[in-house]
């Protein structure tokens, strides 16, 4: 079925499934609020210094349920490093006025953060110090919870120590007054020593599954950043939203309601390659790949002379190519983004979706990808899950 026209059938099928179940069991249909999904947004503090600048004043709070304010940094001894410019009192004030919960996100990509988490989680004393410092920060500035982004456990005991750390955080931030979440990879067992997802589930309100970065500078060919489905043409069979969702619900046994599925507001540009699955020069993509935002860098190229937009019909992923100089860009557009919402929320009934990151589709005037997500939530007829 073409990826440009399948969303409404999912909405009808979802309602029909609920209706049949109700008739068979004699129960009434659930109201929207009981099954309404979340829409979460990672908001990086440094977005204000990007071009175009994106601050808390640009955030359309009515189009999301939660904000994850990224990132403050952990230290090996359990302290917190607060970047200069991180604090935005208006963010908390305006979000709360709109009924949006804000969690502080700690960590992020980078070996330094992973090493800090590894060391601070290794002993009861440093775990306690970390939890104490996080608790003080949340209380002082009025956050509604904490999100941990540990990418990824690498030391032999990290998997066990990560579980102990999350248990301590959950004890300090009880539900429903506070929310505790984790950003987790699409394939946890392929990331360092792995994460004990089944046991971690008892200590988090939800997981944010990072279903993007299926391709990048580490690849040897130009692949797809965040495909909905696994393409049979992918030489490495690196995965997709669907394979990650099946892994978490099937292998790990996690409830769909506890899972938020990610989408990317950025793409990857491969220089020296002009076809999907084309090999990078000299057998490595390390020096030919650039991360570029949708709003400021990718959107202006769509329809521009010399560029061709195509859709991988096997995966649902759009991409741009140029012949001279040879260039390939993997990204998501409004249609592929809406299609993900229709599949994740409408067809599969997962707990929510999120994006990395909220500023990525801002073009100085609007946010096409966020609008596509929000519009699809409205098409599905759901409000946001109770905050």
What is each PLM-predicted segment?
Residues 3-17:
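Bacterial N-terminal signal peptides that target proteins for export
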Residues 16-27:
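Bacterial N-terminal signal peptides
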Residues 34-138, 284-286, 367-383:
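Glycan-recognition patch characteristic of GH18 chitinases/ENGases
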Residues 37, 63-65, 98-102, 142-144, ...:
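Short, well-ordered coil/turn segments that N-cap beta-strands
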Residues 63-64, 224-226, 258-343, 370-387:
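Glycan-binding loop/region signatures in secreted carbohydrate-active enzymes
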Residues 67, 104, 148, 169, ...:
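Conserved, mostly hydrophobic/aromatic
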Residues 76-86, 152-297:
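Substrate-binding surface in catalytic domains of secreted glycosidases
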Residues 131-159, 209-213, 354:
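Active-site groove signature of glycoside hydrolases
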